[in-house]
Curated annotation (Swiss-Prot):
Recorded family membership: Belongs to the class I-like SAM-binding methyltransferase superfamily. Glycine N-methyltransferase family.
Organism: Actinopolyspora halophila
UniProt protein name: Glycine/sarcosine/dimethylglycine N-methyltransferase
Biased composition (Basic and acidic residues): 1-10
Entry GO terms, CC: cytosol
Miscellaneous comment in the UniProt entry for this protein: Functionality of the enzyme could be demonstrated only partially. When the complete gene was expressed in E.coli, little activity is detected and most of the protein is found in the cell pellet. Truncated versions of the protein were designed, encoding the GSMT and SDMT moieties separately: the SDMT was successfully expressed in soluble active form, but expression of the truncated GSMT was still not successful.
Keyword S-adenosyl-L-methionine: yes
Task of the protein: Catalyzes the methylation of glycine, sarcosine and dimethylglycine to sarcosine, dimethylglycine and betaine, respectively, with S-adenosylmethionine (AdoMet) acting as the methyl donor. Shows low level of activity on glycine when expressed in E.coli.
Top-rank taxon, per record: Bacteria
UniProt KW keywords: Methyltransferase, S-adenosyl-L-methionine, Transferase
Sequence positions that bind S-adenosyl-L-methionine: Y45, W53, R62, A86, D107, D134, W135, L152
């Protein structure tokens, strides 16, 4: 029998104090920190808490803080039908109806749905189509396919087991049309776990005189306390999802492109966002359409390196062959000579023969690939996202007669267009910093690596002891929210099963290199003015000085990382 909204509000047995829907007080047992169960949310969203929920959100301020972000995301994709899978008290469902979207409102809490229904009537008389549904059985409880599914309000973190998370994402995926989009948000648990809790209390929980702060945090539990003006307190036990883990789960379910925003911004450098919003597209692209799947960070890097100013700078100032940090015998040594010495140092760490197949990720102008092919007679595949650099690479390679050994491919190292177990060596120099998802890059690297193969790369990194505010100018310049670190790469490579992970710390060369590039740029200023814009040169000099300062101050690390499958 179909339940009415009043039935949902009362629960199956109205008046039964054991019914979590009817109960006014939460129950967490003798030890609340042991409560780490997906189904327990029913005992947390009790009537007394739900009645105060809108005081926490403050619909008016929430509307102002979000602006048109979600509406713009949906309209840009031609969305007409939306499933609001975590409707709560109805804020987004009402907003979507106001904007003309055909919307179904689902939630696992009957009390929340009853509140949402009454809120819909109160706001311009909207009659919400509400469905009491458990995400793990969403196809059973909710019918039809949708252009978009939204799961907002940090709701996904109520799922405590990975099995539940994967099943829920699979249900979302199945209920989307072939070109549908999933939008999920979450607290920035990375920041809370790594550096402690802080909140601007601006975008999501904007109610005045209401606080939402952690009562306990560990790797498996985020217990938040909500305090209201009448001194009443309620708690929610949630799983602290890390951003990259969440992105990985969505990819593994089948979502093709995932963009992550911080507090509704594409880039979120120095100031940590309170919340992340993941926008995941289901539409499948062929290899010829990979450019459409590039993440925002990759698009930013591609546009930069394809620009005329950047191409002229790296070709005429940096050397036009290698675009990476060099190993200098003297601070005034030629950049090209020092840069090739880095290639030689790296090549000496692995056995290379004519039968060796090497993948060079972020190959730039192909200097390393040509050195390896010329010296060892091996085959090198260059993958790089800048079509401008790739064209120069092909022309120089052809001029040197090495085109039979070197293949140049346009692409992103976040989605490698190669089969599993394809390469003996995966090589990269100072490129991974441009990715917004380095965990994904490491997964792709290990996927295409042959058994007993080697991963060999350098990357400008944050030192393991660096504080994020020390990196602000560098991150802002690169439009990134973070850098990798030696500890990060060691952890990721270990997670992926690689062994004998070594880091040759050559950090002292990083400020020397950027200082040398700055000297060359300044000494050739008049000559370069004809083909590199003044604004670009000014910004570049500022950026180079920031690299030198941070390198000398110990906030940056650089060196050769070598790991074996």
């Amino acid at each position: 029998m179909t339940k009415s909204v009043d039935d949902l509000a009362r629960g199956d047995q109205a008046g039964d104090e054991q019914d979590p829907v009817h109960r006014e007080q939460q129950t967490f047992g003798d030890n609340p920190l042991e409560v780490r169960d997906t189904d327990h949310y029913m005992h947390e969203y009790v009537g007394g808490f739900v009645d105060k929920w809108d005081d926490l959100i403050d619909w008016k301020k929430r509307y102002e803080s979000e602006g048109s972000f979600f509406i713009d995301q949906l309209r840009a994709r031609g969305v007409e039908t939306v499933l609001d899978a975590a409707a709560g008290t109805g804020f987004h469902s009402v907003r979507l109806l106001e904007e003309g979207f055909e919307t179904v409102s689902a939630d696992g809490s009957p009390q929340m749905l009853a509140k949402a229904f009454s809120n819909g009537l109160a706001y311009n008389g909207h009659i919400l189509r509400v469905v009491n549904a458990d995400w793990r059985w969403l196809n059973r409880d909710v019918h039809g396919e949708y252009d978009a599914i939204i799961c907002l309000g940090n709701s996904f973190t109520h799922l405590f087991s990975e099995r539940d998370r994967r099943k829920t994402l699979a249900e979302f995926y199945a209920m989307l049309k072939h070109d549908g989009v999933l939008i999920i948000d979450q607290r920035n648990y990375d920041s809370i776990l790594d550096t402690g809790f802080s909140s601007k209390h601006t975008y999501y929980y904007a109610g005045e005189d209401v606080s939402a702060e952690p009562d306990h945090i560990d790797d498996g539990l985020a217990r938040f306390k909500y305090t209201f003006p009448d001194k009443s307190e309620f708690f929610l036990n949630m799983y602290p999802l890390r951003k990259d883990y969440m992105r990985r789960l969505m990819r593994e379910v089948g979502f093709q492109r995932i963009d992550t925003y911080g507090d509704f911004q594409e880039t979120y450098g120095e100031d940590e966002p309170d919340f992340y919003i993941h926008v995941a597209e289901k539409s499948y692209r062929t290899e010829d359409e990979f450019v459409d799947m590039y993440s925002n960070a990759v698009h930013t890097a591609r546009d930069y390196y394809n620009s005329e100013d950047a191409d002229n700078f790296y070709y005429h100032v940096w050397g036009g062959n290698d675009i990476h940090v060099g190993l200098y015998q003297t601070p005034q040594e030629d950049i090209a000579t020092a840069s090739e010495r880095t290639v030689q140092r790296m090549a000496g760490k692995v056995d290379i023969s004519p039968e060796t197949r090497i993948l060079d990720l972020g190959a730039g102008y192909g200097g390393a690939a040509r050195y390896l092919a010329r010296t060892y007679g091996c085959h090198v595949t260059c993958l790089n996202l800048s079509e401008v650099e790739n064209q120069r690479n092909r022309e120089i390679t052809r001029a040197e007669g090495l085109e039979h050994l070197i293949e140049v491919t346009d692409g992103s190292f976040e989605d490698l267009p190669y089969q599993d177990n394809a390469f003996d060596v995966v090589w990269s120099q100072d490129s991974f910093l441009h990715s917004g998802d380095r965990s994904r890059v490491m997964e792709e690297v290990t996927r295409v690596l042959k058994p007993k193969g080697s991963v060999l790369f350098t990357d400008p990194m944050a030192s393991d002891s660096a504080k994020k505010n020390e990196l602000g100018p560098i991150l802002d310049r690169l439009h990134l929210d973070s850098l990798g670190s030696p500890g990060f790469y060691r952890k990721e490579l270990t997670r992926l099963g690689l062994q004998n992970i070594e880091f040759e710390d050559l950090s002292e060369y990083l400020p020397v290199h950027y200082g040398r590039v700055l000297e060359v740029l300044e000494s050739r200023e008049n000559e370069l003015a004809g083909f590199i814009g003044e604004e670009y040169r000014a910004h570049m000099k500022t950026g180079l000085r920031n690299w030198v300062q941070a390198g000398n101050g110990g906030s940056l690390a650089w060196g050769i990382i070598h790991a074996r499958a």
